[in-house]
Design a protein with these regions (language model features):
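Extracytoplasmic/periplasmic solute-binding protein
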Residues: 165-181, 185, 204-257, 292-294, ...
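Short, solvent-exposed loop/beta-turn-alpha elements that line the ligand-binding surface or hinge
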Residues: 52-53, 138-153, 198, 226-228, ...
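Conserved N-terminal structural module of periplasmic/extracytoplasmic solute-binding proteins
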Residues: 2-14, 18-25, 33-133, 147-149, ...
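Long, aromatic- and glycine/proline-rich binding clefts that accommodate carbohydrate-like moieties
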Residues: 155, 330-337, 384-436, 440, ...
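Short helix-initiation/N-cap motifs at beta->coil->alpha
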Residues: 94-103, 203-204, 283-297
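Hinge/lid segment of periplasmic solute-binding proteins
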Residues: 49-52, 123-184, 233, 330-336
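Glycine-centered hinge/linker elements that transmit conformational signals in sensory
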Residues: 208-209, 253-286
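Extracytoplasmic/periplasmic substrate-recognition and gating elements
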Residues: 173-174, 193, 270, 274-280, ...
Length: 474
């Protein structure tokens, strides 16, 4: 959190820089403060050219949730960005994952933030844009970013609103963010228990996990996210929904009821609750990222699913019982892309970085400069070597990334298979409905079919009452 500091007399050059910066960003700040004559808020525009940067000491603050990439980003930025901007300190403030959305949007609602760069899930963008919380950086991107260096879907997923259909980018749509960290699920499997070759289909994966559990008492067949918090249980169901041929909604008609709970959706819920859940450990009904990693590290799971960006600790001998060295652990652990079934879809993870509409002008200018710096090819490769997951194609295909971790090839191979959720302002309410009901079904508190029908009905009610448009994903 940034606290007020006593400010002494500014030097003349410092005052000139501040005045120039304020002048170029004044329109954006006024729009963000609601000076729009009472009309519906929209994102204020950032300038195409980066305003003159201050030479005074400055802290550039991010907000993210507490996980290893947050610490990696802070360390990386303070080591590398300060080579270009020695007066700048980078601070990545973290909150628990379950509080991440509210920690940002509570401050947005107050139109005053103690962060300059909010790191948003792709699904948060619509809410932030329609409320005027983040800057429209379309003109800035055109002037400063090589958009052809990115897979169009990733550029759209982490910055575009309204979102296009999965796999497409609308060249005429506005951009409100740039990729910070790519991510998807990886299948983590015990090579010493099930063999070197991972299961190729979802049905085969379940059969292999069941046999492994039977053959190895004390080891669960599966470990995956089930918690009623963040997007844990919802992403698990949505992933199974996708591979069994289901859809979450019809984005053109904003129809959910009759789509998510169609025959494919019901089959996916049946597979999740009646075939996968019995292969998990007792008491795992509220597991999320850390609990799944702990089960793998302790040798308690045959097959697990987790986000790639959260998997680095699995190779740390200090945290694992599978070996005393990284090499010994890798003799037992394998990482693979998700199995296919009726489709080959995998969940889009990762986040983009954005500029708070309520930050001081000097911080907004610095944020734009940081984004331009961060998206350079050589910096993206350094970020990959430091443990990040880049989105630039040249960085994804670089030895710096592919050789950094054994699961990085999984991400590179998964990009073309990704799908997202609903990119609409009502996302937070939709995800809460789905988490609650999927978690209830997984824990035996609700019949699976009833849970899915309730999801469809309640989510449809949210969209119907909102009456808005926009969004995308499948």
């Amino acid at each position: 959190m940034r606290y007020p500091k006593q400010i002494g007399r500014l030097s003349l050059p410092g005052r000139k820089v501040q005045l120039a910066t304020v002048a170029m960003l004044m329109a954006a700040t006024m729009a963000a403060c609601g000076q729009d004559g009472g009309t519906e808020a929209s994102a204020p525009k950032a300038p195409a050219d980066i305003p003159e940067l201050t030479k005074d000491p400055l802290t550039l603050s991010f907000i993210w949730f507490d996980w290893p990439p947050a610490k990696a980003l802070e360390d990386f930025a303070n080591a590398e960005y300060t080579k270009e901007r020695s007066n700048v300190t980078i601070k990545v403030n973290t909150v628990p994952n379950a509080n991440w959305h509210d920690a940002m949007f509570t401050q947005f609602a107050a139109r005053k933030t103690d962060f300059d760069i909010p790191i948003l899930d792709s699904q948060h963008i619509g809410e932030a844009v329609t409320n005027g919380n983040i800057l429209d950086i379309t003109d800035f991107v055109k002037k400063n970013i090589d958009v052809d260096a990115y897979n169009p879907y990733l550029l759209a997923a982490y910055g575009q609103f309204p979102q296009a259909e999965t796999g497409q980018r609308d060249e005429n749509a506005s951009l409100y963010g740039l990729p910070l960290l790519g991510d998807t699920w990886t299948m983590i499997y015990r090579k010493d228990l099930i063999g070197d070759k991972p299961p190729q289909t979802w049905d085969e994966m379940i059969a292999v996990a069941e046999k492994c559990q039977t053959d190895n008492p004390g080891v669960s067949g599966l470990a995956f996210h089930q918690a009623n918090g963040s997007d844990a249980a919802a992403v698990t169901y949505n992933t199974v929904n996708g591979v069994y041929g289901g859809k979450l909604w019809d984005s053109k008609t904003r129809k959910i009821e009759g789509v998510i709970n169609d025959a494919a959706g019901q089959e996916a819920m049946d597979v999740l609750v009646n075939k996968m859940k019995p292969l998990t450990a007792a008491g795992s009904g509220n597991w999320f990222i850390d609990e799944v990693n702990a089960a793998v590290a302790q040798g308690k799971a045959c097959i697990a699913f987790n986000w790639i960006a959260a998997s680095g600790g699995l190779l740390d001998p200090k945290e694992s019982t599978l070996g005393t060295t990284r090499e010994e652990i890798l003799e037992k652990l394998g990482f693979a892309t998700l199995p296919k079934q009726k489709t080959d879809l995998v969940p889009l993870g990762g986040m983009g970085m954005h500029v708070s509409a309520y930050s001081p002008a000097a911080q907004q200018a610095e944020a734009l400069n940081f984004m331009k710096w961060f998206e350079q090819a050589d910096i993206q490769k350094k970020w990959a070597a430091a443990g990040g997951v880049p989105s630039r194609t040249d960085a994804l295909e670089s030895p710096e990334f592919l050789n950094a971790q054994p699961f990085n090839q999984v991400y590179a191979d998964s990009v073309s298979r990704m799908r997202d959720m609903w990119n609409v302002p009502e996302y937070a309410r939709l995800i809460d409905i789905e988490n609650t009901n999927v978690n209830a079904a997984l824990n035996g508190a609700k019949n699976p079919k009833d849970a899915l029908n309730d999801i469809a009905k309640e989510q449809q009610g949210v969209l119907d009452s909102a009456g808005g448009k926009g969004g995308g994903g499948l």
